[in-house]
């Protein structure tokens, strides 16, 4: 039997790997699972991002669900977190999102959701895979085929976010925010949310267009160079950029400086933990020690997991976590949506900024300082075995290691992580330390150990 799902859902080139027939079968497999679990008329929420192939794949997936006797709520184009929120909001039995997140425009994918909006559990995912390949589908009688209805979730989703922040404090300061939604699903939410919060807003690339004509939807520093200049030139308080499905938010300060995701995650975590009087912060093995400092400051605990937003979300749910996130700008508010939410993150950052009375750059520069370096090596063959060899070498040399995900060598003032990519023939090396010199030294150590491991 083949393997369909990656860390969260399945992705590929639209109409080559992810075809209408493929989406139809996923819909039939998911619907069959829900029917076999004893639900008489399962209800499934389905939505998509702005990709050109989205409508085709959504309609095929819905057809598959209807054929098994599932009722479907089609929410159209919406951010992934809005669809996750809606799945929970409508008390649905499951959800499905047609998205390839930050991938280039020719890609698309499918994510399946639990009733609480979180990504499907591994054991249920395995059943969907088994049904997909065996084609042992439940086919409803002609008079038991599911019904389809359409719902607009954008307004209630925006209202739900507004209810979670201090709108009056924001209106009082009236921040000037420049927004780049990458022609993605966030185009329908973020500019409107910020205006309703009382911000002055200038938006760029904010019309839905699945060709992503303005930039690659991955909101990294390289792709945001032009946007960084716009934020500075307009004299904005800060800028915010999103990826294709709007589950992440990346920030630019008033000087046009790109802010690393773990710094904005730290700002949010600091506020949330303070409001909760402590709690549990969940993040990955690759995130900055800055988050440990923030947790300590607020009397909170830290749990570190493997890399992956769904892994963080599961850990938050299982351990009653307070706040979660990753170094790439993805923040999870578990009592709102059990997944990364770019709009909720932005609303919280706007509130923090408004209440502080400070410049955005000041909020960032007040955080404990760490230096980070990253590099990568193209490696064919069994990358996990090579990373395991790095662990063996490090242990022999007497280093303290953590093998939660890859090989992390831990020092008193920093760390280096050697980790195989789950999607590309690449091994990544990340380092961090309190000084630039040490961070470089740790990166060099990671490179040296990897080279030794590659020699065998």
UniProtKB/Swiss-Prot annotation:
It catalyses: alpha-D-glucose 1-phosphate = alpha-D-glucose 6-phosphate; alpha-D-mannose 1-phosphate = D-mannose 6-phosphate. Optimum temperature is 90 degrees Celsius for PGM activity. It holds the Pfam family PGM_PMM_II. Its EC number is 5.4.2.2, 5.4.2.8. Its cofactor is Mg(2+). Can also use Ni(2+), Mn(2+) and Zn(2+), to a lesser extent. GO terms for molecular function: metal ion binding; phosphoglucomutase activity; phosphoglucosamine mutase activity; phosphomannomutase activity. The modification Phosphoserine is found at residue 101. The keyword Protein biosynthesis does not apply. It is an enzyme of class 5 (isomerase). Induction: Up-regulated in the presence of starch. InterPro entries: A-D-PHexomutase_a/b/a-I, A-D-PHexomutase_a/b/a-I/II/III, A-D-PHexomutase_a/b/a-II, A-D-PHexomutase_a/b/a-III, A-D-PHexomutase_C, A-D-PHexomutase_C_sf, Alpha-D-phosphohexomutase_SF, GlmM_arc-type. Mg(2+) binds at residues 101, 243, 245, 247. One of its GO terms (biological process) is carbohydrate metabolic process. Activated by phosphorylation. It comes from the Archaea. Keywords: Isomerase, Magnesium, Metal-binding, Phosphoprotein. Optimum pH is 7.0 for PGM activity. The keyword Cytoplasm does not apply. The active site is at residue 101. Belongs to the phosphohexose mutase family. NCBIfam families: Arch_GlmM (TIGR03990). Catalyzes the interconversion of glucose 1-phosphate and glucose 6-phosphate, and the interconversion of mannose 1-phosphate and mannose 6-phosphate. Also displays low activity with deoxyribose 1-phosphate and glucosamine 1-phosphate. Homotetramer. This is Phosphoglucomutase/phosphomannomutase. It comes from Thermococcus kodakarensis (strain ATCC BAA-918 / JCM 12380 / KOD1) (Pyrococcus kodakaraensis (strain KOD1)).
């Amino acid at each position: 039997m083949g393997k369909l799902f990656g860390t969260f859902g399945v992705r590929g080139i639209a109409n080559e790997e992810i075809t209408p027939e493929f989406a139809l079968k996923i819909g039939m497999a998911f619907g069959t699972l829900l029917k076999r679990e004893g639900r008489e008329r399962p209800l499934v929420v389905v939505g998509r991002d702005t990709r050109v192939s989205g409508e085709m794949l959504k309609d095929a997936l819905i057809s598959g669900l209807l054929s098994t006797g599932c009722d479907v709520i089609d929410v159209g184009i919406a951010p992934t977190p809005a669809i996750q929120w809606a799945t929970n909001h409508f008390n649905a039995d499951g959800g499905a999102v047609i998205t390839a997140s930050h991938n280039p425009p020719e890609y698309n994918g499918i994510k399946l959701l639990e009733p609480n909006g979180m990504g499907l559990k591994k054991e249920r995912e395995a059943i969907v895979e088994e049904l997909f390949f065996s084609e042992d589908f439940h086919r409803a009688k002609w008079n038991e085929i599911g019904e389809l209805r359409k719902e607009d979730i954008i307004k209630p989703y925006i209202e739900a976010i507004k209810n979670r922040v201090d709108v009056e404090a924001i209106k009082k300061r009236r921040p000037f925010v420049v927004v780049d939604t990458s022609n993605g699903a966030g185009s329908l939410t973020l500019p409107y949310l910020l205006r309703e919060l009382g911000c002055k807003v200038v938006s760029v690339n904010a019309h839905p267009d699945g060709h992503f004509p303005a930039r690659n939807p991955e909101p990294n520093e390289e792709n945001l160079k032009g946007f960084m200049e716009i934020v500075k030139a307009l004299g904005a308080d800060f800028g915010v950029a999103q990826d294709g499905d709007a589950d992440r938010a990346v920030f630019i300060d008033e000087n046009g400086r790109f802010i690393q995701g773990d710094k904005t995650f730290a700002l949010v975590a600091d506020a949330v933990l303070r409001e909760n009087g402590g709690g549990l912060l969940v993040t990955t093995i690759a995130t900055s020690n800055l988050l440990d400092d923030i947790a300590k400051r607020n009397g909170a605990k830290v749990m570190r997991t493997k890399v992956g937003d769904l892994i963080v979300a599961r850990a938050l749910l299982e351990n009653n976590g307070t706040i979660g996130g990753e170094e790439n700008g993805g923040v999870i508010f578990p009592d709102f949506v059990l997944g990364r939410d770019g709009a909720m993150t932005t609303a919280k950052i706007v509130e923090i900024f408004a209440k502080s009375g400070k410049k955005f750059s000041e909020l960032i520069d007040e955080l404990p300082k760490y230096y980070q370096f990253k590099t990568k090596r193209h490696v064919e063959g069994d990358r996990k075995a090579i990373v395991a060899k790095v662990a063996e070498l490090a242990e022999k040399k007497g280093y303290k290691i953590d093998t939660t995900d890859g090989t992390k060598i831990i020092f008193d003032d920093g760390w280096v992580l050697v980790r195989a990519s789950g999607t590309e023939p690449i091994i990544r090396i990340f380092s961090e330390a309190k000084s630039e010199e040490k961070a470089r030294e740790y990166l060099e150590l990671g490179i040296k150990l990897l080279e030794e491991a590659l020699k065998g």
